Every structure is written in C-alpha cells, then in structure tokens.
Design a protein with these regions (language model features):
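Short loop/edge segments at beta-strand edges and connector loops
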Residues: 5, 99-101, 176, 200
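C-terminal beta-strand of the catalytic ATP-binding
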Residues: 123, 212-216
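Conserved AdoMet
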Residues: 1-38
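Class I S-adenosylmethionine-dependent transferase superfamily signal
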Residues: 35, 61, 136, 158-162
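Conserved Class I SAM-dependent methyltransferase catalytic core
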Residues: 149-213
Length: 217
C-alpha cells in the first residue's frame, strides 16, 4: 500500500516512499526512541544515520532532538533522492543533509566527527531472502535487505571502520534482526564499546543494541 500511495508515516512524520527504499517499520521506532532519549541530553550533537533508506530514523531524531544536526548516509541513488525529498518535506533543511556513503567501506575524511551513529542496516541472511513473504521479497529493494551470508556483514563493517568518526563517549545504536542481538553486542565490545544494552521492541523481541565508545584501538 505504501508504494501505491507513495508515502508512509514514521514517528509522526509523513514521508515520501518509493520502491528504492524499505517501508519504515514500527520496530524501528524502538531505535528512534532510544537515540532521541540520549541525544536530548547532549549539547548540539552531530548524528550520522548510516544506511538511511528513506531517512526516517535521522529525520525522526532531528524532529524530536531540536539541537541535533543529522547526516543521512545512503549508497543507493534512488534512496538518496527520497532522503532529500523527505528533508524538504519535513522542513529540516537547516539541520539535516544527505550524502552518498557506503557503510561497507571506510568513511571519507571530509565527514568529520559524530557524537552518535544510528543504523538500521541490511540484516537478512542472503539465503533467507527467497523465503521472505512475497510482499517483501518481490517489492522491497534487496539491497536494503541482504546482510550477507549470516546477516552480519554491515555490523562488522560499521564496527571495524566507522568507529573512527566517533570519539570516546560517543554512542553507536543498531537495529538488529531476530537472534542477532548477542552477536552484535559481542562485535561492539570487541572494538571498544561499553555500557552495552539490548532493548526489546513492543513485541518483546530484542531489537536494539547500543553502547558508548570507551577507548581508542
């Protein structure tokens, strides 16, 4: 239905949607709430929404944490167009920008530093995609679904490469798939994140893993 009407609501924001992006899920509001609660306590935080898709997560953060400045990072040309449309639609052009970024590669030096990275990356194991419900498998972009053989490719890459744009005390917040929370927590711990938490979605499924960068490696 979202693709037919070309829009969807997320965290109270009406957003443009196309077949270049995933339809925003209520599960992702768990990640938005966790990030917003922390960011409201920071002074003028700089936030990166990596694998931004429609931009729903970063735009929700910008709308609810008025001091935040947000970069929407997305590789897909089609998704990047939707991000830019939604920045304008939400009236957030002063504090939100969109950039073409590849989460699987090290960040560009010109990006600068961030106080928080939020990411809802592709996390479906490649072999599970043929078995997805047809409404997802046949219409939503596989680029936004496929997380590699075990679904963890993007978590590994972000933990390995993107911690370099954070400083001690910065926060990393992930949405994760069913059964992935413990593995992602271990990945984060292995690269210097502490105060790690796993948060459930409204159905009680472990859905968010977050932590603060403690040390340089």
């Amino acid at each position: 239905m979202a693709y037919l009407i070309g829009e969807w609501e997320f965290y109270g924001l009406p957003l443009d949607i196309s077949e270049s992006v995933l339809i925003p899920r209520p599960d992702t509001e768990t990640l938005a709430e966790a990030a917003i609660g922390w960011l409201r306590q920071q002074e003028a935080p700089r936030v990166l929404d990596l694998c931004a898709g429609s931009g729903c997560l970063g735009l929700a953060i910008a709308s609810q944490a008025p001091g935040a400045r947000v970069v929407l990072g997305e590789l897909s040309d089609g998704a990047l167009r939707i991000c830019r449309q939604n920045i304008r639609r939400c009236g957030l052009t002063g504090r939100v920008t969109a950039m073409q970024l590849d989460a699987l590669r090290p960040p560009l030096q010109r990006l600068g530093g961030f106080d928080c990275i939020v990411s809802n990356p592709p996390y479906i194991p490649s072999g599970d995609i043929p078995g997805l419900d047809a409404s997802v498998r046949d219409y939503e972009p596989h680029m936004a679904l496929d997380g590699g053989a075990d679904g963890l490719d993007f978590y590994r890459a972000i933990c390995a490469h993107w911690r370099s744009v954070l400083h001690p005390g910065s926060r990393l917040c992930f949405e994760v798939g069913i059964g992935q929370a413990d593995d992602v927590l271990r990945l984060m711990r292995s690269v210097g994140f502490g105060d790690l938490e796993i948060l459930p979605d409204p159905a009680g499924i472990p859905r968010v893993v977050l932590g603060d960068l403690y040390q340089e490696i």
